[in-house]
Design a protein with these regions (language model features):
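Hydrophobic alpha-helical membrane segments of integral membrane proteins
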Residues: 6-13, 34-35, 84-85, 125-147, ...
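Hydrophobic residues within membrane-embedded alpha-helical segments of Major Facilitator Superfamily
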Residues: 14-15, 22, 42, 85, ...
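Hydrophobic alpha-helical membrane-insertion signals
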Residues: 18-55, 61
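C-terminal ends of transmembrane helices
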Residues: 19-29, 94-107, 149-159, 218-220
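Membrane-interfacial loop-to-helix junctions in multi-pass inner-membrane proteins
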Residues: 26-43, 80, 105-119, 131-137, ...
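Hydrophobic alpha-helical transmembrane segments in multi-pass integral membrane proteins
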Residues: 36, 40, 59-124, 211
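Juxtamembrane/interfacial segments at transmembrane-helix boundaries in multi-pass membrane proteins
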Residues: 54-73, 135, 142, 175-220
C-alpha cells in the first residue's frame, strides 16, 4: 500500500501553521519549545512517510490542487527520488528541531526565528513535492525568502547583514536562471507541468543550455 501524498501535504500545512503560531508564541516562555516540538513531530512523520515510500518500492503518487495557474493548478508528486530527499531533509529537520528545543531558549529575539524556521522547512518540502514549474518556483522563492529571514535574525551584526544581502542577490539570480530553464523546457506551447516537460524532445543545444541554467540556478 502506497503512502498517501496527503501525508506530505498535511505535513506542509502543519509547518506553515506552526510558522503562524510562532508569532504569538514567541512572547511566551514555553513558546520556543512548543514550536520546535511541533516541527520535530511533523518532520518525523514526513521522514517516516518518505522512508516507507522507498522501502515499499511504491509507484509514484500525485495530486493536483485547485491553486496556482488556472489551467494546470498546483501539481504535486512523490516518486523514489523525491521520497529519498524527503527522508534526508526531514531527518536533518528533526535533528535541528531537537537541538532547537534546548538551544532556542538562549535566543534573545525568538520572534525573529520562530515564525520562519517552520516556514523554511515547509518551503524545502514543497520544492521536493512540486510537479510543475509554477509550484516549484513559488516554493523555491518561498524557501529562499524564509532562509534569508533566518540569516537576518541577527541583523544588527554587520557580517550577518552583509551575508543576508549577498544571499538575497544570489537567490534572485538563481530564481531567474531556473525561470529561464523552465521556459525552455515548456517550449512554445507553454506546458509547465513536469510530465509535459519530460515528454518534450529537446535538441542537444537546448538541452545543454537548460542543464547549464539549472546548475547555475540550483548552485547559487
Amino acid at each position: 500500500m502506497a503512502v498517501p501524498i496527503g501525508l506530505f501535504l498535511i505535513g506542509d500545512a502543519a509547518l506553515l501553521a506552526l510558522g503562524g503560531a510562532g508569532i504569538p508564541l514567541a512572547r511566551r516562555p514555553a513558546g520556543t519549545r512548543m514550536i520546535y516540538a511541533g516541527t520535530l513531530v511533523v518532520s518525523l512523520a514526513m521522514l517516516g512517510g518518505g522512508a516507507l515510500h522507498l522501502l515499499r518500492d511504491s509507484a509514484p503518487i500525485a495530486a493536483t490542487l485547485p491553486l496556482g495557474l488556472p489551467w494546470i493548478g498546483a501539481c504535486f508528486r512523490v516518486d523514489a527520488l523525491s521520497a529519498f530527499f524527503l527522508a534526508v531533509i526531514n531527518l536533518g529537520a528533526a535533528c535541528a528541531s531537537l537541538y532547537g528545543m534546548g538551544y532556542g531558549s538562549h535566543e534573545r529575539e525568538p520572534q525573529r526565528v520562530l515564525p520562519f524556521f517552520p516556514a523554511f522547512l515547509a518551503g524545502m518540502n514543497l520544492v521536493l513535492l512540486a510537479d510543475d514549474g509554477f509550484t516549484f518556483l513559488l516554493s523555491w522563492e518561498f524557501m529562499s525568502l524564509t532562509s534569508w529571514a533566518l540569516v537576518m535574525a541577527h541583523h544588527r551584526a554587520r557580517d550577518n547583514a552583509r551575508a543576508g544581502f549577498v544571499y538575497l542577490v544570489m537567490a534572485s539570480f538563481g530564481t531567474l536562471a531556473l525561470l529561464l530553464a523552465f521556459g525552455l523546457l515548456a517550449g512554445p506551447d507553454g506546458g509547465y507541468a513536469f510530465a509535459t516537460m519530460r515528454a518534450h524532445d529537446l535538441s542537444p543545444a537546448i538541452a545543454g543550455l537548460v542543464l547549464g541554467l539549472v546548475l547555475l540556478g540550483a548552485g547559487s
